UniProtKB/Swiss-Prot annotation:
GO molecular function: glucose 1-dehydrogenase (NAD+) activity; glucose 1-dehydrogenase (NADP+) activity
This protein's encoding gene: gdhI
Function: May play some role in spore germination.
EC number: 1.1.1.47
The name this protein goes by in its record: Glucose 1-dehydrogenase 1
Annotated active site: Y158
Length: 261
């Protein structure tokens, strides 16, 4: 538990399921106030709110698409209107879909780039704007991936979005460090989330993925949520401009870098 997170206001994009849901619940257990964001699945968002209530937390759900500028502006403003402030912005919303690079349409490319990279930029921009205007030493956390470092065949758009996120985060961290605003990435490896459920349900595919992880197991969303809580806390007060990989050592494993996966 991080005492200084109590009363902090945390906005998490794409938090009706997966990593976002785990982070929302973790911050609620830290007694932070949480803004749950969803694009279309209101029922799932409401389910997260119920789980937050069960742990004694306080939260609201705000609908919005991170690729739509006005939606992102509204998301941040909703946080301020409901809770009076914003302390932590977590740009978690993301997507992936496998397509051979030579067959990838511009629409395929743009959809992933707009969600993963432009969406994170818009969230970062709006949060930092509020921090600067109100002299708040806030924190931005962007959800990157091991694929900001590891090439990924069939996912050139995804890898490009995460590679771009790396330098975006480093640039924002450098630009706003003098104001005490911290900006960092989390780089998850293979995690048990709904997006991976079908793959990991297949014993052969699961074993293949586990063979590329030196620690030998697929991570849980709660392990990523723990990293986010630390980065948002004062325990990480001198940390900015990094990608903290939470991947069981996957980024160090040569067989993956040789093209497996």
């Amino acid at each position: 538990m991080y005492k200084d997170l109590e009363g902090k206001v945390v906005v998490i994009t794409g938090s009706s399921t997966g990593l976002g849901k785990a982070m929302a619940i973790r911050f609620a257990t830290e007694k932070a106030k949480v803004v749950v964001n969803y694009r279309s699945k209101e029922e799932e968002a409401n389910s997260v709110l119920e789980e937050i209530k069960k742990v004694g937390g306080e939260a609201i759900a705000v609908k919005g698409d991170v690729t739509v500028e006005s939606d992102v502006i509204n998301l941040v403003q909703s946080s301020i209107k409901e809770f009076g402030k914003l302390d932590v912005m977590i740009n978690n919303a993301g997507m992936e879909n496998p397509v051979s690079s030579h067959e990838m349409s511009l629409s395929d490319w743009n959809k992933v780039i707009d969600t993963n990279l432009t969406g994170a930029f818009l969230g970062s921009r709006e949060a930092i704007k509020y921090f600067v205007e109100n002299d708040i030493k806030g924190t931005v956390i962007n959800m990157s991936s091991v694929h900001e470092k590891i090439p990924w065949p069939l996912f050139v758009h995804y890898a490009a979005s995460k590679g771009g996120m790396k330098l975006m985060t480093e640039t924002l961290a450098l630009e706003y460090a003098p104001k005490g605003i911290r900006v960092n990435n989390i780089g998850p490896g293979a995690i048990n989330t709904p997006i991976n459920a079908e793959k990991f349900a297949d014993p052969e595919q699961r074993a293949d993925v586990e063979s590329m992880i030196p620690m030998g197991y697929i991570g849980e969303p709660e392990e990523i949520a723990a990293v986010a809580a630390w980065l948002a806390s004062s325990e990480a007060s001198y940390v900015t401009g990094i990608t903290l990989f939470a991947d069981g050592g996957m980024t160090q494993y040569p067989s993956f870098q040789a093209g497996r996966g």
